[in-house]
Amino acid sequence: MLDDRKLDVLKAIVTDYVSSKEPVGSKALVERHGLRVSPATVRNDMAVLEEEGYITHPHTSAGRIPTDKGYRLFVDRIATLKPLSAPERRAIQAFMTGAVDLDDIVRRTVRLLAQITHQVAIMQYPVATTGTIRHLELVSLSTDRILIVLIMSSGSVEQQIVELPGHDEQSLAALRTRLNETLVGLTVAEAADSLNRFLDDLGPAEGPRAASVIATVLEILAVDPSARVVVAGVPNLTAFGAQWETAVRPVLEALEEQVVLMRLLGEATAGEAGEVTVRIGAENTDVPFQSTSLVASTYGPEDALSSLGVVGPIRMDYPSTMAAVRAVARYVGRFLAEG
């Protein structure tokens, strides 16, 4: 069990190493942090910390750097979350207020999180709750193709192009009207049932073309938007420095895999709703992310939680990053709830 002085030394080492990227020596710690003990005493404390596995020394350097275990202790017992500044809070509110629909909210949120933290931000699409269909639009693109646009009460917009040879504007308008009369105000489950009944009632003349449209609408309704993850701030991977082949390239490749990102966020936020969680190094089960840290939180109503977070180097400013993730998660949750 480490006493308070050794915890103070570890905190000072983590703080200095994160800001300077250089190994930290005992003399510098005493001078910068007012530890009120001699460098010799600090060296003894550092020796204990190293023996316990909380710090190590790279190569022949006289300075020390934190290990993953050291960062873990720092996050769990030492770190104090830094509240966002008033300008940062105002910037979040202003940035979110301009959003026009759900897709825009997600894009703005993930970009904002990347900008605030200077890390790679990842965000799961909101989990659908009891949203209903607001409108269905059928747009003729050519003589043999149309665009189907489905707008939900949540603001989400799904669209898909379908081949529809031989259609005309009059029949398309009639089908659009009938489908909106059938679907508007229904939940996804209710809409699927209604569309299946709609198919049964089609006449022989309109059947084939309408069936093609309805089949596509059913496909759109079956898609779960919350299985999508949006990424922003990939250029921030330069924070890894020269570790391209060993760290950055595998992370870059993994960021392209939606299933991997969903698993990463899901495992990190499996605990209590609304809490900020931190996964450090090998605590991440996916190998490419074992050279990184993940700071994540949930957002949204308790019965439909989604996740967001940031990925960055293990040498991370945890207090600031955790505060930013918590603040953005709360803001986007409130913003979505207010509609």
Curated annotation (Swiss-Prot):
Query: Which key words are in the record?
Result: Repressor, Stress response, Transcription, Transcription regulation
Q: Which Pfam families match?
A: HrcA, HTH_DeoR
**Which terms does the UniProt entry file under GO BP?**
negative regulation of DNA-templated transcription
Gene Ontology MF terms: DNA binding; DNA-binding transcription factor activity
Query: Which InterPro entries does this entry report, sorted A to Z?
Result: DeoR_HTH, GAF-like_dom_sf, HrcA, HrcA_C, WH-like_DNA-bd_sf, WH_DNA-bd_sf, WHTH_transcript_rep_HrcA_IDD
Q: What does this protein do?
A: Negative regulator of class I heat shock genes (grpE-dnaK-dnaJ and groELS operons). Prevents heat-shock induction of these operons.
Task: Output the PANTHER family linked to this UniProt entry.
Answer: HEAT-INDUCIBLE TRANSCRIPTION REPRESSOR HRCA
- Provide the family line: Belongs to the HrcA family.
- What this protein is called in its record is Heat-inducible transcription repressor HrcA
Q: Which organism is it from?
A: Cutibacterium acnes (strain DSM 16379 / KPA171202) (Propionibacterium acnes)
Q: What is the organism lineage in this UniProt record?
A: Bacteria, Bacillati, Actinomycetota, Actinomycetes, Propionibacteriales
